[in-house]
Amino acid sequence: MQNGRALACTPRKFAGKLQVMDVAVILPGGRGWGPVLKLAEIAAEHLGGRLIKIPAESLPAGRLGKLATLLPPPRPRGEQKLLVIASIGDHLNAVLRSGVRRHYSYVAGWVIDSFWEARIPRVARSRGWYDHLYVTDQQDLDMWAAAVPCPVGVLPWGADVAGAQASWADKQVELQRVGRQPQVWDDDDAVAGAAANAGVSFAGRPPFGDTDEANQAFVETAYRQAKAVLAFGTRTARAKYNHPTKDYVTARWTDSLAYGCLVAGQVPDTPTAREILPSFALVQLSDTDVAQGLEQLKAALTQYDEEKFTAIRTWAREHLDWRSRLDQIAADAAVN
């Protein structure tokens, strides 16, 4: 546990006593996980604990991980509590690292990509390793609840709304591309040409940074300047790393709303998406015809003004901020 670092912060108070939780996040390597790392940093600060960064390659896996779960978990010796933020189910194996489970009286796990049924790990299915688990979409709840012995809750993807610095004066780009897109929207040069012909200002994908933190900073600058962010669900914007049939909300939608942007494209068709994404901030675009989509966007932009920008930010603050999710985790830990 020596790779954790102390953060100066105020613990949350529940049930008449301070609740402090350490936060472990697994670093999978590669780009694209910046939002998860940022969530972990916010969580450690908000919950008053240490932030512990664990390289994915150090997790027990295969035969070693299986053998570890054949024995009952060690009896905890302390009263400390731990939240494991797992980008994928396999990252829950963090509690199998030597000494981890003995150190904590209560361990919760929050699985971000919770849609993979085949990737619910043995450690989650085994009694005593986790006290509470959370998934990010209601559509995943039943399969996890049927597979694991501990309580399972739904905590949707959110955003650092409190930290999102944006003003109406910043909004100079009418359409900002972020992330994967359907084939007809994927060529930034072609879309830029079509947008110019339609009288729409367009910015292609943000540059990639040398680190996750730098990459995240580029993306946040793009959100800050955008009136609308281009985003399509996995049904129309396939990639080999996506689930082949399930749709789901990612950071593009929630971060866009945190910065007061419209989200233009096609919304994931899930119960949680319908709950947390406000219809007044969504613009349906064609996934097969860029010219048609740009006309749909232009119509929506005529209704996008400072009042709507403020309304979107207000919605995000009330429904999407990570800290409200973390308060639920702390409250559940206090009950236990």
Give the ranges of each region predicted by the language model.
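Nucleotide-sugar donor-binding catalytic core of glycosyltransferases
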Residues: G4, P11-P73, G78, A86-V95, ...
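Short, conserved loop/helix-junction motifs that constitute active-site signature segments
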Residues: G99-Y104, A124-G128
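A charged, aromatic-enriched C-terminal amphipathic alpha-helix characteristic of glycosyltransferases
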Residues: T288, A299-A333
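Conserved acidic donor-binding segment of nucleotide-sugar-dependent glycosyltransferases
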Residues: T250, A281-D289, A300-T302
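Active-site proximal beta-strand in glycosyltransferases
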Residues: V100-S114
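C-terminal helix of von Willebrand factor
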Residues: W144-A145, G293-L297
